[in-house]
């Protein structure tokens, strides 16, 4: 039986096995506390996330179960990798994942990115999204702070707590406002994997211009900012809106023509703007997919169709429609943890194929210098 150490970190009881040493707080949110720590078995640093009160309600327990199942299933080098799961004596859930040095949000808050970093980062984001979407999963909360990066330019998407099955009817609580797709604001219940592509487009625009493209103060202001740049929603979009009040709101907007994105982003190549135009399309049915975006000429230096894997099959979402009491979810979570511990940690995703035409070494050196200058390492 594992031995536990108890500490108090940021006023929170933090229990961890003796496998880990030197926990240091790196993040705190409504769903948990995250600490860096050193794994004495793998001799690698990890991020230890304590999920706060996972069994307080059936909805929290279900969210925890969903996140654990997704982390166990999704295995790709541009997604955060699960290292360990354990349940503490106080019955809190702890998830250990690989630790990367910083996140994109932090980098963007310090100084603008060089265009070559923006190009490589959006390639990796889309590469990860292709895999996620092929598993029939929507991330739903893609934003710079959920994009982790290390000094070698390796990028990994994290935080699958809000991820969902792609299906016709969806709940409306998703995504930080700046990166929220218009179809979510217009209908709230009908959307697909295209919402992640919109979020990725907003992230690309922010990397290129050095500040958010649509920094809305509220839901209505957010939509005004979008239409101010992209013009009014086409009739095909309005026809799909299910709320009469929303239809009336959209029709009440002043007439606006799309602006030239190059005048909004400024000083960047037309090829980057062309990809952005295809990602930031109000109608999700005509928005480019992650897979097609990888083939865009802007990403030609990195694109390798033999090294952009899809999932082995769709994720099993059969549990997601269940409305179990929290005690049942608790048993299911315990079962998943025991299964993980008994089966063991699957092999990490393979690194980039060295036969790819892209040699990242020079870019890695430049990015390491960028991080050093920014005080991130």
UniProtKB/Swiss-Prot annotation:
Dually phosphorylated on Thr-171 and Tyr-173, which activates the enzyme. ATP binds at residues 26-34, 49. Residues 20-299 form the Protein kinase domain. Its EC number is 2.7.11.24. Its cofactor is Mg(2+). InterPro entries: Kinase-like_dom_sf, MAP_kinase, MAP_kinase_CS, Prot_kinase_dom, Protein_kinase_ATP_BS, Ser/Thr_kinase_AS. Activated by tyrosine and threonine phosphorylation. One of its GO terms (molecular function) is ATP binding. It comes from the Eukaryota. A motif (TXY) lies at residues 171-173. It holds the Pfam family Pkinase. Keywords: ATP-binding, Kinase, Nucleotide-binding, Phosphoprotein, Serine/threonine-protein kinase, Transferase. The modification Phosphotyrosine is found at residue 173. The keyword Iron-sulfur does not apply. Belongs to the protein kinase superfamily. Ser/Thr protein kinase family. MAP kinase subfamily. HOG1 sub-subfamily. Mitogen-activated protein kinase required for growth on media where sorbitol or mannitol is the sole carbon source. This is Mitogen-activated protein kinase mpkC. It comes from Neosartorya fischeri (strain ATCC 1020 / DSM 3700 / CBS 544.65 / FGSC A1164 / JCM 1740 / NRRL 181 / WB 181) (Aspergillus fischerianus). The gene is mpkc.
């Amino acid at each position: 039986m594992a031995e536990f150490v108890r500490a108090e970190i940021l006023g929170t009881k933090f229990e961890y096995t003796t496998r880990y040493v030197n926990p240091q707080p790196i993040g705190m949110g409504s769903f948990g506390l995250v600490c860096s720590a050193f794994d004495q078995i793998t001799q690698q640093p990890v991020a230890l996330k304590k999920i706060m009160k996972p069994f307080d309600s059936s909805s929290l327990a279900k969210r925890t179960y969903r996140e654990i199942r997704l982390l166990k299933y999704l295995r790709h080098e541009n997604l955060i990798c699960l290292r360990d799961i354990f349940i503490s004596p106080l019955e809190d859930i702890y998830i250990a994942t690989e630790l990367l040095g910083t996140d994109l949000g932090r980098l963007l808050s310090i100084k603008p990115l060089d265009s070559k970093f923006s190009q490589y980062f959006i390639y990796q984001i889309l590469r990860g999204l292709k895999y996620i979407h092929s598993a029939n999963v929507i991330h739903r909360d893609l934003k710079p702070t959920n994009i982790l990066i290390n000094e070698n330019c390796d990028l990994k998407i994290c935080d699958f707590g809000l991820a969902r099955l792609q299906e016709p009817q969806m709940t409306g609580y998703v995504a930080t406002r700046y990166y929220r797709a218009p179809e979510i604001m217009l209908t709230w219940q009908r959307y697909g994997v295209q919402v992640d592509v919109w979020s990725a487009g907003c992230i690309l625009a922010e990397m290129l211009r050095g500040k958010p493209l649509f920094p809305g103060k509220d839901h209505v202001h957010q939509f005004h900012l979008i239409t101010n740049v992209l013009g009014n929603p086409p009739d095909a979009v309005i026809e799909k809106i299910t709320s009469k009040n929303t239809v009336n709101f959209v029709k009440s907007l002043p007439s606006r023509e799309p602006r030239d994105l190059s005048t909004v982003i400024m000083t960047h190549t037309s090829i980057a703007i062309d990809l952005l135009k295809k990602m930031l399309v109000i109608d999700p049915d005509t928005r480019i997919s992650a897979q097609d975006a990888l083939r865009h000429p802007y990403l030609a230096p990195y694109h390798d169709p033999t090294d952009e894997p899809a999932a082995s099959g769709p994720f099993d979402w059969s549990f997601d429609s269940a409305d179990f009491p929290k005690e049942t979810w608790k048993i299911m979570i315990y079962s998943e943890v025991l299964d993980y511990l008994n089966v063991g940690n699957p092999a990490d995703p393979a690194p980039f194929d060295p036969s790819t035409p892209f040699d990242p070494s020079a870019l890695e050196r430049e990015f390491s210098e960028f991080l050093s200058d920014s005080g991130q390492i």
